[in-house]
Curated annotation (Swiss-Prot):
Name this protein carries in UniProt: Synaptobrevin-like protein
Organism per entry: Schistosoma mansoni
Cytoplasmic side: 1-81
Domain spans labelled v-SNARE coiled-coil homology: 18-78
Transmembrane segments: 82-102
Keywords: Coiled coil, Cytoplasmic vesicle, Membrane, Synapse, Synaptosome, Transmembrane, Transmembrane helix
Subcellular location: Cytoplasmic vesicle, Secretory vesicle, Synaptic vesicle membrane; Synapse, Synaptosome
Length: 131
């Protein structure tokens, strides 16, 4: 027997082949979409971790800023105290210098008066002896 194939007999084969190609394309797209969804989930996880680290860094930065401000004020006061002590020392040094200079002047005046008194005494005794 002779079997004659017509166009209608070949149509199911072509349709079946097209269906298989379409199914293969759908499977490929599904695989790509699964990979993309996995990547999106991984990125979301990474972003969540990064967000947590950013929050921790922000909290640490705020704490650092507060402690840096306290430290700045502490050293500012230390600097003020040091300048006050230095100022007092300079004033004391100036007072000591003034007292020393005044006492030196006083000593010179006293020595000058003492020596002029001796000179007057010597002259008067010399004058008395001549008469």
């Amino acid at each position: 027997m002779l079997h004659i194939t017509t166009m209608t007999d070949k149509a199911p084969i072509k349709t079946n082949k097209r269906l298989q190609q379409t199914q293969a394309q759908v499977n490929e797209v599904v695989d790509i979409m699964r990979v993309n969804v996995d990547k999106v989930l991984e990125r979301d996880k990474n972003l969540s971790e990064l967000d947590g680290r950013a929050d921790a860094l922000q909290a640490g930065a705020s704490q650092f800023e507060a402690s840096a401000g306290k430290l700045k004020r502490k050293f500012w006061w230390k600097n003020c105290k040091m300048l006050a002590v230095l100022g007092v020392l300079v004033v004391i040094l100036i007072i000591v210098l003034i007292v020393w200079v005044v006492s030196e002047q006083k000593n010179k005046v006293e020595q000058s008066e003492h020596s002029s008194h001796h000179l007057v005494m010597d002259n008067s005794s010399h004058l008395l002896s001549e008469q």
